[in-house]
Amino acid sequence: MNIIEQLDKEQMAAREAKIPEFGPGDTVTVQVWVKEGGRERLQAFEGVVIAKRNRGINSAFTVRKVSHGEGVERVFQTYSPIIESVKVKRRGDVRRAKLYYLRERSGKSARIKEKVK
């Protein structure tokens, strides 16, 4: 193991506790630190995870929501210090790893059924 991989592992271990297990189709709420002027505050972003990219410290996930009839997507770096917490609101039952087809859909056709345990 080279020194870069070792540093990545240490950084990931420090941030691991705040991130629960989730995947595509899950509805999550991400609490993000936002800087406005001279002050910082927490902002919630709730939506469906449409993609997840697992690349060690460079891991990321994309969350999509519809706000005022307009689709909004945001890509979060999984181990970023601006992410305060991630909460899974509901588990979705999907058969794909990337749910990009939801971009073309709206209304009832964009719904994802809930996973039954």
Curated annotation (Swiss-Prot):
Single GO cellular component term: cytosolic large ribosomal subunit
UniProt cross-references to Pfam families, sorted A to Z: Ribosomal_L19 (PF01245)
Cysteine pairings via disulfide bonds: none
Gene Ontology BP, a term: translation
Keyword Ribosomal protein recorded: yes
Superkingdom field: Bacteria
Alphabetic keyword roster: Ribonucleoprotein, Ribosomal protein
Single Gene Ontology MF annotation: structural constituent of ribosome
InterPro entries referenced in this protein's UniProt entry, alphabetically: Ribosomal_bL19 (IPR001857), Ribosomal_bL19_CS (IPR018257), Ribosomal_bL19_sf (IPR038657), Translation_prot_SH3-like_sf (IPR008991)
Role according to the record: This protein is located at the 30S-50S ribosomal subunit interface and may play a role in the structure and function of the aminoacyl-tRNA binding site.
Annotated family: Belongs to the bacterial ribosomal protein bL19 family.
PANTHER family: LARGE RIBOSOMAL SUBUNIT PROTEIN BL19M (PTHR15680:SF9), RIBOSOMAL PROTEIN L19 (PTHR15680)
Name of the protein: Large ribosomal subunit protein bL19
Source species of the chain: Alkalilimnicola ehrlichii (strain ATCC BAA-1101 / DSM 17681 / MLHE-1)
Gene: rplS
